[in-house]
């Protein structure tokens, strides 16, 4: 079922199975520690809905603000996966409704027939992918490689996991970009990520988390344009996540 891929649910086979299916054995204990640190796989699997507000500010190379947008997100994870995102821009209301069978973009209540539905779907799924880290590293079809440790400029020593994706083969993959994830070597805390989106690199720093939720979710992040060695060129974006509401599904006692 598609829902199993989206939620990383092993469909009753226990929480150890996703880790056992990771080919690189060095990745397994590191990722398990990171997911435990973030609240645990079982907790993530039992989320029914997540809603939150996201503010995104994009910057040009000279520091000028390119855009400043506030969006409201609702993800229904089970029993049937769906997404609703809405925001106001230039006096108009925009809304995206997504399910595994369709994706619709509306402006002021009218369906936008000109929208690229493939790109829209990728954007929606990328949002869940970002929000669900590090849990989403267990998505079916993800290829992992352990690349040792590195010292981040923020001072932490981090384990580096490289992740690659094949969207042509796996419908739950939203990108073919190459990602690197930086997890605290001592406790598995998700510190940062880097993505190669041809022809540029972006380094995303996780600055603060909400720690009063069933799982640990972002509060504040910054994204920098960097080179392949993570040398910063300029601040590209800043993100704030607020107003989280999480509804948990009832545990199956069978």
What do the PLM-derived regions correspond to, one by one?
Residues 1-3:
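Sec-dependent signal peptide recognition
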Residues 102-173, 197, 252-254:
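Flexible, processing/modification-adjacent segments and terminal tails
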Residues 12-14:
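Bacterial signal peptide processing site
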Residues 156-254:
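Gly/Pro-enriched, hydrophobic low-complexity segments
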Residues 21-28:
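Soluble non-cytosolic domains of exported or imported proteins
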Residues 22, 33-111, 147:
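N-terminal mature ectodomain segment of secretory-pathway/periplasmic proteins
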Residues 43-47, 154, 215:
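Edge/loop elements at the starts and ends of beta-strands within beta-rich repeat scaffolds
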Residues 8-10:
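C-terminal motif of bacterial Sec signal peptides marking the signal peptidase cleavage site
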């Amino acid at each position: 079922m598609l829902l199993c891929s989206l939620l990383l649910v092993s469909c009753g086979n226990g929480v150890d199975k996703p880790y056992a299916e990771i080919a690189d054995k060095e990745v397994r204990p590191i990722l398990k520690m990171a997911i435990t640190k973030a609240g645990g796989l079982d907790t993530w699997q039992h989320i029914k809905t997540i809603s939150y507000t996201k503010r995104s500010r994009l910057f040009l190379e000279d520091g000028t603000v390119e855009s400043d947008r506030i969006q409201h997100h609702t993800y229904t994870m089970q029993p049937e996966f769906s997404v609703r995102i809405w925001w106001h821009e230039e006096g108009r209301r925009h809304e995206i409704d997504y399910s595994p069978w369709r994706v619709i973009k509306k402006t002021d209540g009218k369906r936008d027939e000109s929208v690229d539905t493939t790109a829209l779907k990728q954007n929606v799924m990328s949002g869940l992918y970002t929000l669900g880290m590090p849990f989403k590293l267990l998505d079916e079809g993800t290829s992992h490689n352990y690349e040792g440790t590195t010292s981040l400029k923020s001072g932490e020593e981090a384990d580096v996991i490289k992740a690659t994706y094949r969207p042509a083969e796996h419908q739950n993959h939203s990108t073919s970009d190459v990602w690197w994830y930086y997890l605290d070597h001592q406790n598995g805390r998700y510190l940062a990520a880097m993505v190669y989106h041809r022809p540029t690199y972006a380094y995303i720093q996780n600055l603060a988390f909400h720690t009063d939720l069933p799982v640990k979710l972002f509060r504040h992040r910054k994204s920098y344009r960097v080179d392949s060695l993570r040398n910063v060129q300029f601040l590209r974006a800043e993100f704030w996540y607020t107003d989280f509401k999480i509804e948990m599904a009832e545990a199956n006692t069978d």
